[in-house]
Amino acid sequence: MTITGAATDAVRGSVADGFEPVRDAFAALLAAEGAPLDAQVAARYRGRPVVDLWAGPETGPDSLQGIYSATKGVTHLLVALLVQHGVLDLDERVAHYWPEFATGGKQDLLLRELLAHQAGLVGTPEGFSVDELSDDHLVAERLGAQRPFWRPGTSSGYHALVESALTGEVVRRATSAEVGTLVRELLTGPLGLDLHLGLPAEAELRFLAPQPMIATPERLRELAAGAGSPDGLPGIAFNRRHPDGCEVWELPAHPVVRSRGPASLGGIGTARALATLYAAATAPVDGRPALLRPDTLAAFAQIQTAGFDLVLRQHKAWAVGFHASSEVYPMLAAGSFGHSGAGGQQALADPRNELSYAFLRRRFLVPSQADADHARLLTALLRSVRGSGAAA
């Protein structure tokens, strides 16, 4: 149904009958922002689109934004497909595919452990320039030759900017193809998705550059508490040491990041495309069978490690290559999985409830407030499903 009504004047797009609570939650989020916000939210239920909304002075249905670390989720959906087809094995050593990796005590690290941020290779002491960070081959070469910061497989620490450069090197060694090429050929291309690891030049005019956070004392305190020293693991993981680095929120603004599409952080797309991709991974979409079998979904959605994250400095549960989404959003069913992105981006699937969800915002936001926003939208989405009598 087309949106009308004074309460939702800022919201454009459509929701299916019964999913009006999501529209209302999105309108409330916009009203609470305190300034005009460019944002998109999309969802699918049982494979069909039920939410496709956008707002903001510059945003349309096809506007493109940086998805930051939600790119990892896209990359790891590719890894899941390759595991399903027997090209990769979660219980094989990384060094089996990448022999040069077997140095500095890393020789026994398993692929599933690499995917769950257990490698101890969160960055380099000297850091990376933006140009270097956008080059997955260079990042993988440096980290593959490096001694880890902890004994691999014994702890976890968020490999914020480099995780999928490492898994991408495994993919490249096993397939002789680049991650971006395989994502396009196996995932986004067949589905016709406006989601890119390597933005085509002709799509540049639709890209919206990111905007900095609206600073408040509370938000600044949260950022400072999570930053730590540049010399500590958080500083290394978030690349705070290199003189030619940049703030995380600025990364998609760099043309080299957009054009190369590094597999950890360089994805550009729409909320509609992300929601469709996660739907297609778990359910039939547009006449196509689900990309992943139930046993593959279960293997990747299971919790691989849970405990104190050495980078995030808080308790964190990691599935295999994904966030264990129900640990963050308890309203979701067990087995939900996805990946957030810096500043408030989110994409996930709840297979038991047959839902997929994606949200993109242009202006950076601290994690606690982003999580609260997603919780409200997801609660509204599940309320809509329960209205149909179908929620798990």
Summary of predicted features, one role per range:
Residues 26-27, 47, 66-92, 167-172, ...:
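Active-site SXXK
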Residues 262, 283-286, 296, 301-308, ...:
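Short, gly/Ser/Thr-rich active-site loops of penicillin-recognizing serine hydrolases
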Residues 61, 69-70, 82-126, 144-145, ...:
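Active-site helix/loop module of the DD-peptidase/beta-lactamase fold
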